[in-house]
Amino acid sequence: MNFSKIFIFVVLAVLLLCSQTEAGRLKKLGKKIEGAGKRVFKAAEKALPVVAGVKALG
């Protein structure tokens, strides 16, 4: 019975410590995805007037 309480405490402590290191990796991944999204948005912003003009002609 005592071992299970200690085991649960150790598992919770490890999860708390590991969650801090995971946040850095996830933050970096999120920034990369955000940058890619911005590039796609800017490219679409440039291409949409051209596409609208071609569609109006055709």
UniProtKB/Swiss-Prot annotation:
Effect caused by changing N2H: In strain: GAM4B and GAM6B
GO BP term, example: defense response to Gram-positive bacterium
Keywords, alphabetical: Amidation, Antibiotic, Antimicrobial, Fungicide, Immunity, Innate immunity, Secreted, Signal
Keyword Nucleotidyltransferase: no
Tissue expression pattern: Relatively abundant in head, thorax and to a lesser extent in abdominal carcass and anterior midgut.
Induction: By bacterial infection.
Chain positions with Leucine amide modification: L57
Cleaved signal peptide residues: 1-23
Reported effect, E34D: In strain: GAM12B
Cellular compartment(s): Secreted
Superkingdom of source: Eukaryota
Pfam families assigned to the protein according to its UniProt record, in alphabetical order: Cecropin
InterPro entries xref list: Cecropin, Cecropin_insect
Any one cellular-component term (Gene Ontology): extracellular space
Keyword Heme: no
Role played: Antibacterial activity against several Gram-positive and Gram-negative bacteria. Antifungal activity against A.fumigatus, B.cinerea, F.culmorum, F.oxysporum, N.crassa, C.albicans, C.neoformans and S.cerevisiae.
This protein's name: Cecropin-A
